[in-house]
Amino acid sequence: MEGVVLLHKPKGMTSHDCVFKLRKILREKRIGHTGTLDPDVTGVLPICVGRATKIAQFLTSETKTYEGEVTLGFSTTTEDASGEVVEKQDVNRTITRKEIEAVLAELTGTLEQVPPMYSAVKVNGKKLYEYARAGQEVKRPVRIITIHEFTLLDNRETFEGANISFRFRVTCSKGTYVRTLAVMIGEKLGFPAHMSDLVRTASGEFQLHDCVSFEEIEENMQNGTVESVFISIDEALSKFPKIVVDEKQAEKIKNGMFLKNEIQAETPFITVFDRNNHCLAIYEHHPKRPGMLKPMKVLVNNQELKL
């Protein structure tokens, strides 16, 4: 049993909870997720099973797309709806669509972001949420993130009320804290804010409409059709730049042979496939030999090599 399961993560579960539950359903220990989703967030969570755990690190590097809701009027300890209220300030003026769109435009591009205290980022060997739960504030590292697209989904021209909510879509780089973006939006509009709802609709090429629920996985497990919920390793990696090698080269790949970067791809890594469209290995740019590639992860051995 191996491959990638596109789980439609339910609300209220951590990513670790999802892995634990899937281990019980599939009766498989080698399972790992491809990036943390907060308990309040639902949506696309790719989970690697069996030999596919070898490729988890390559699936986490993909851009993510979310649809969510920002609420102005109060902020929380966790920057989302699950936290305790920290600051309250009624929205005492009309906010226009143009104002919000201008803020979203300002937050598009390369930004600096400080991760929230309630997060899994480690400082001095401890996760930030461990400090937060102990009532300790520590200096947090600044991250460089990229917001590729930030769109207002609400079609109203004006927003009024003590608490104002509006929906958005954002496509961003790995490591972006979208709930922190909600706080940043509030700051620029002059009011405390938090993320009141969030759904991950895409992780790289993986889309929400392709995801399956725990119930569907359990049903397929009982019916003996569980393989239908898996995406193969080859398919999961097929969207990345690739080099196709012949039989002679394929035989040498498993021994870590260097390759020429024949396609001149500038991406961090390049996949290597045989002529039967089977992924043999994942390569990266050689740090000392320009134009050459060296193996990062070999996915085949003598028994697994399929030619």
Curated annotation (Swiss-Prot):
MF terms (GO), sorted A to Z: RNA binding; tRNA pseudouridine(55) synthase activity
GO biological process entries: mRNA pseudouridine synthesis; tRNA pseudouridine synthesis
Entries under CDD domains matching the protein: PseudoU_synth_EcTruB
Keyword set, alphabetical order: Isomerase, tRNA processing
Source species, domain of life: Bacteria
Keyword Membrane: no
InterPro entries linked: PsdUridine_synth_cat_dom_sf, PsdUridine_synth_N, tRNA_psdUridine_synth_TruB, TruB_C
Catalytic activity, EC: 5.4.99.25
Keyword field contains Isomerase: yes
Catalytic activity: uridine(55) in tRNA = pseudouridine(55) in tRNA
Active-site residues, as the UniProt record annotates them: 38
Xref: HAMAP family: TruB_bact (MF_01080)
Protein family according to the UniProt entry: Belongs to the pseudouridine synthase TruB family. Type 1 subfamily.
Function: Responsible for synthesis of pseudouridine from uracil-55 in the psi GC loop of transfer RNAs.
Protein's name in the database: tRNA pseudouridine synthase B
Organism of derivation: Bacillus cytotoxicus (strain DSM 22905 / CIP 110041 / 391-98 / NVH 391-98)
